Regions:
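Nucleotide-sugar donor-binding catalytic core of glycosyltransferases
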Residues: 1-204
Length: 204
C-alpha cells in the first residue's frame, strides 16, 4: 500500500498531507494542520537542543511529539513521555543464531564479547565506557574494543589484540554473542541504537 498513487508515500516536494519531524530542533515550515504533524525524538534531552522558538512553534503546529523524557520546560500537552524512534544498522536477511556465532565464528577471533567506545568524554556514559575499556585492557579481559575512541588506547596499549579500532557497519555485533551497551544518559523511555544494533544481530 505504498507508492505515488497509494495511501502512503513519502515525498520530497511541498505537496503532502502529513508530516513527521525527526528530532527537528530547527523550526521547519509546515503547511498541514497540527493533527497531521507527528514529532519523534531519537536523542535524549541533552542532545535534542530544542530551542524556545521550536517549542513555541510546536505548541501551534505539532499534534504529538513523542520524547523519551519530558523536561520541566516542555509543558505542552502534546509532548508525550514515550520512546520515539531509533535507527539501527542494516539487518541481515537471516540473523545468525548464538550457536552459529559460538561454534562457527572466525577461528582467529578468540573473544565473544564486544564493546564500542567513541572519542567523546562529555556524557556520563561516555566517561564510564572509557573507564571500563581501560579496566578491560589493564586486566586483559576477553572483550574486544571497537570505535574511534580506541585510538588513545592504541598508544597506551600498543599491539594489544583486544583493540579492534574503527568499524564500518556491523563488525562489533555480527560475530559476537554478547555486546556491552552503556547509554550516554539515563532517561525514562529512552534507549539508543546501541541496543537495537545488538538485537538486530542477536548479540544480547
Amino acid at each position: 500500500d505504498y507508492g505515488p498513487d497509494k495511501r502512503l508515500y513519502i515525498t520530497l516536494n511541498q505537496t503532502y498531507t502529513h508530516a513527521i519531524l525527526l528530532n527537528c530542533p530547527i523550526v521547519p515550515t509546515i503547511s498541514v494542520p497540527p493533527e497531521r504533524v507527528l514529532g519523534l525524538a531519537f536523542e535524549p534531552i541533552p542532545y535534542l537542543r530544542l530551542s524556545y522558538d521550536f517549542i513555541h512553534f510546536a505548541e501551534k503546529h505539532v499534534g504529538l511529539y513523542y520524547i523519551g523524557h519530558i523536561h520541566p520546560n516542555l509543558t505542552g500537552a502534546f509532548f508525550k513521555e514515550h520512546h520515539g524512534f531509533m535507527w539501527h544498522v542494516p539487518h541481515p536477511q537471516i540473523p545468525p543464531t548464538l550457536e552459529e556465532k559460538y561454534y562457527k565464528s572466525d577461528a582467529n577471533q578468540r573473544n565473544k564479547i564486544s564493546i564500542i567506545v567513541s572519542n567523546k568524554m562529555k556524557a556520563p556514559g561516555n566517561a564510564y565506557r572509557h573507564k571500563l575499556a581501560t579496566f578491560i585492557l589493564i586486566n586483559n579481559l576477553p572483550i574486544d574494543i571497537w570505535g574511534n575512541g580506541t585510538e588513545m588506547y592504541s598508544k597506551r596499549f600498543p599491539n594489544h589484540k583486544n583493540i579492534k579500532g574503527l568499524f564500518k557497519d556491523s563488525e562489533p555485533y555480527e560475530s559476537y554473542t554478547l555486546s556491552i551497551c552503556i547509554e550516554n544518559y539515563r532517561h525514562p523511555h529512552y534507549f539508543s541504537e546501541k541496543i537495537t544494533n545488538c538485537l538486530v544481530y542477536n548479540a544480547t
